[in-house]
Amino acid sequence: MGPMGLAAGLLAKALGAPLTVGADVVESRLDLGRRLGAIDAAVPADDHAAAAVRGLTDGGCEVSIDCSGSTAGRLVALEGARRWGRCVLVGEGNRLDVDVSRVLIHRQLTVLGTWVTSVWRMEELVERLARWDLHPERTVTSRFALADAAEAYRVADEGLGGKVALVTDG
């Protein structure tokens, strides 16, 4: 439940998702997701995470999203999706080795990869954030002056909280 996962959860709730489930290896990030209302339920991102997600969602998520970019996170998203479900991979990096027949083909899973959106989509999102009264700045857990950028990067690299922001005086 890093910044992207928190944002995905908040947007899913705004779009009417009846249940959002977060998975992370860091408990404090799951706590933050609960406090912000981004997730309704949390599972530890371990070897049993996909099974736990399927148990909470009556067989799997209609839509699962991996924002981590980690191999383990991607597998949880793929295996936590229901038959005929959709899985969106957002996080950058790493490789993915998956049993294509078992995980994708036999379950009729649709997998989407996405990166950066277009300007008009971003404008649409900003308008909707205002209409839905969503405030993504709530995902910011640490703020640093530009002069403290090295410390900000250290905190972000620890991966224990939400978004880390560099701010200016003006």
Predicted regions span which residues?
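Rossmann-fold dehydrogenase core element
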Residues: 86-88, 99-139
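C-terminal hydrophobic helical "lid"/dimerization subdomain
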Residues: 75, 119-170
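A local structural motif
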Residues: 17-18, 60, 133-138
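Glycine-rich cofactor phosphate-binding loops and adjacent beta1-alpha1 units
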Residues: 31, 35-110
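Residues in the short beta-alpha loop(s) of Rossmann-like NAD(P)-binding domains
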Residues: 25-26, 93, 117
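Glycine-rich phosphate-binding loop at the start of an alpha helix
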Residues: 2, 6, 27, 71, ...
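Mid-domain Rossmann-like dinucleotide-binding core that forms the NAD(H)/NADP(H) cofactor-binding site
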Residues: 1-46
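Glycine- and other small-residue-rich loops at beta-strand/loop junctions that grip anionic moieties
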Residues: 1, 22-23, 42, 62-67, ...
